[in-house]
Amino acid sequence: MPTLVAWSAQRSFQRGSLGAAASGWSTRSGSAYSTVGSAAATWAGEWWTLGGGGTVWDSMSYDPDLDLLYIGVGNGSPWNRRIRSAGQGDNLFLASIVALDPDTGDYVWHYQTSPGESWDHTATQQITVADLTIDGAVRRVVMQSPKNGFFYVLDAGTGELISAEPITELSWATHVDMATGRPVETPEARYEETGQPFASRHNPNGVHTWHSMSYSPETGLVYIPAMESTFPYVADPNFEISPVAFNSAVDFGALAAEVRP
């Protein structure tokens, strides 16, 4: 008899920060089945003292045809990578779509939408599985429009990047390099490194957040509830970890009034 597993996003508060995992339990016995921590060895400094982030707080999708579970991983904590990870590393698996074997919890593939993110960029948004005709061939794909403003189409079985296009005007990146799969960041986007305010064309809520998007096989279109807004990202020069604070290491009291997006 096949094992039935109930999967759940899981998060825990760690000194004002969030740590996360995806966990499974047998639906028959209730016993823990497997756990996958949403972190890897692409970090620097003593990031574990702050938790690191990586919450799986919203989207998970299951494809019965491929027998894969897709989880969307959240932002880093603190947001400011200079504080979180000594300004270094991609910080896997933050801001990533991760495919897992649902029977074992084993890693299959991942795609990171915002490597080394510093802007509260989550990839927890809805993950839609569909069959699309691309270049004359039907392909099984996953689609996501995460906070960072790009719309991604990936091969559902391998994670291969098929397309990545912005759905609105962005200021943190110009485009996604299709050869590397990485966003090409603008010089001013790394506010934590430049020491200057960065006027983002979207705020920490993102261009698209937890509001559902829809795909119509009849029209071949995806419908996304998108937002346009601005936000001044400024590194907090006086940041100290607190058990009762948001701990973003971003100065929410600052106003970059002289900086135009």
Question: What residues fall within each predicted segment?
Answer:
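Beta-sheet-rich non-transmembrane sensory/scaffold domains
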Residues: 1-261
